[in-house]
Amino acid sequence: MVAISMIWFFTKRMPRIFALAFNLISIFLLIFLLIGCYNPSNQSTFLVKYKFDDNSPFYTIIEKSYEKSNTTLGLEEVIIRSGYMGVCIDNIPSQYSSYNNMTTFSNSICYARKNLSSVPLYRDLEIQLSNIASSSSKTQSSVVLNILKLAQLTSVNVIHPYVLMATVILTILMFLFILYVTVPKLPFKLAVNKFLLLLSSTIVLTWGIGAMWTHVGINASYRLVPSSSMNIITVKKGKKAAVMAWFSFAFLLLDSVVLWLIFLRDRKSLKDEIDNVPCAQNRYNNYSSDSSTLHSKV
């Protein structure tokens, strides 16, 4: 009997269980997307990847620029990945640690997105391409390119994490409310169900905007950075992050659709129950003239 009761319990609440499953998948996708490039273990979840193009005619100039000092030798081979919460630098030369007094060395290191200007690599990755004389002055101005600064600008100024953070918090809140209405014999379920409809629609709208902005930011960097750097820097789009963003949106949309269908089903069931209630006999028909003429026959 217990097994039958459990089967009936889950069968009756299967739509809400699907909603919980969709919600839980969305939470995991959004969290892994948020912490991408926060440490070397999850740097594969990047938004944009930058590196110097070794086919560029300026590549030899970049090599010579880094060869001027033993501390920067080989930095032209670095790969920089930009994420929501941080920036990861990969393929760091092995000799770089000895010249910078690093106690432990790894060829990959990640920094928080707003704490880059103070790290040694930020200054060491600056390259001076040429000196251009001004038409109004005999003095020459330096043309400086910093690949790490471009990655920082992507994470700080182009693709912001705040919409994603708000979506994660609201999605976790929605999971708790769905879990609440799934448990039987709890009060205020009607109010919570109505609130869930509003909350799910808000989350879909919020992350819909966030996913579209992520798509725009990734493609803007992909198209603008190579041209603006005279094709010195190549850019690769983070397909994994883009897929996670759109799949999480799809699951949130499914979640909202399921909740609306459950609400409409419950409203229809309630209406059918009200319609099936038999009408009570009118106690005011005390005289034969008050009733139908069919009942007034002698």
Curated annotation (Swiss-Prot):
A biological-process GO annotation: cytogamy
Annotated localization: Membrane
Effect of residue 236 to N: In strain: CLIB 219
Sequence positions bearing Phosphoserine: 288, 296
Effect of substituting residue 223 to I: In strain: CLIB 630
Induction: By mating pheromones.
Keywords: Membrane, Phosphoprotein, Transmembrane, Transmembrane helix
Segments passing through the bilayer: 17-37, 163-183, 195-215, 243-263
Outcome after substituting residue 220 to E: In strain: CLIB 413 haplotype Ha2
Identification of the protein by name: Factor-induced gene 1 protein
Organism whose genome encodes this protein: Saccharomyces cerevisiae (strain ATCC 204508 / S288c)
Gene for this chain: FIG1
